Amino acid sequence: MDVRAQIVMVFNLDKCIGCHTCSISCKNIWTDRKGAEYMWWNNVETKPGVGYPKQWENQERFKGGWVVDGSKLKLKAMGKGPTLANMFFQPNMPKMEDYYEPFDFDYGNLAGAKEGDDQPVAEAFSQISGKKIDEIQGGPNWDDDLSGSQIYAAKDSNLQDKQVIDSYDSMFMQYLPRICNHCLNPACAASCPSRAIYKRGEDGIVLVDQEVCKGWRFCTSACPYKKVYFNWQSGKAEKCIFCYPRVETGQCNACAHSCVGRIRYVGVLLYDADGVEAAALKKDDELVEAHRSLILDPSDPAVAEGARKNGVSDQWLEAAVKSPVYTLVKEFGLAMPLHPEFRTVPMAYYIPSLSPVLSVWGDTHKLLEHGMIPALETLRVPIGYLASLLSGGNHRVIEEALKKLIALRVFMRGENLKLPVDPAVLQEAGLDEAAAKRLYRLFTVAGYNERNVIPAQQREMQDPQKRRQTAGFGILKKTRGDK
């Protein structure tokens, strides 16, 4: 057992309101510069929809992630032959039209235009070429809230029954916030010929070494989530850095800090690195349970001892015990990885959203009178859609999570209204009263330090006296002849 620690984020899709505050805060901090205009390390997508870049989930086109080759994994579009043939050209990489041509407006024309009969306007121009754009063709959330659109929603690869968006009674919508998943088996790192992408041992964050990156762009093609971008100005790859300068000092990510709905939970998970490859080899519908089997109980003395042998500090072990992420992912099995069938073992997890009852199934008030639990097939968001999105097609794990969420609501409704609740409601969902109240607090009134349990980085524990003895005064001696 090789115990490692990873900083992980969980998203509660039931609480996301699609305000894009997280995207704007991330953009203003990290990608507000030339060459990065089209980069959205954090973005929020409307589902069903094509996403950003368009149809990123369609791996038949983009060929990202891993596939099983006998008893081993191999990159879907990579190998010695394809790597050599595509060294200077990436046929599977998203094109500019799959993103959008970044634009701005000539606001100076509003004040500086010549006098005339027409009101001056701020014309759009390309931030890449500087040329005028007559008609804007796209944006980072171009299909925002268009979940019933035949142009966008119908192209969602997770939507098996396209007819559900044809009728107002059956169409549905939910938001999907996305960042880099900082995977345990990152395809971007495996594909890089220069080995510029690495996964940090201390916290699991995946980063790009800008000094080593040669701009081959294999990482952009290999990442199935398309969260690695190419900076056309610097010629380097860039991606979400999980706000590591903040995380290292015990602060949560900018996206989580600014989240209006407080949908994000950040904490430490301990996992068994020896089992990652075997977990990624499982069948699609077994991947969620395989992922969960990798996560270790931080309260287990054997796990704690193994973590200490690998340099995990007591501060991190204490944070792992208090982690809300462990509670949601492992203890209660509510959170699941996004598209585990890509086999990168992503370490960002999502709690599936509840949804209203379909009106086509009858009178809603009769169906739900006095706390009656609705049948899962009557929920507006199809189980199959959520399974395609979060569990590799495994309906059972989605149903188990939804049953717990529904039972939690029924129980807390009874608590708040002082109504009797049948204990079997919680028992059948695998919960008890104490567990229900823990989850209720975590989902509703939990404070900042409950939702974000982030220990400061271990490197700060080094004795300053020893550091001073080995570092000296830091004076750079010049050789003769240097000025």
Feature-to-residue mapping (PLM):
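Non-ligating segments of multi-cofactor redox enzymes
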Residues: M1-K483
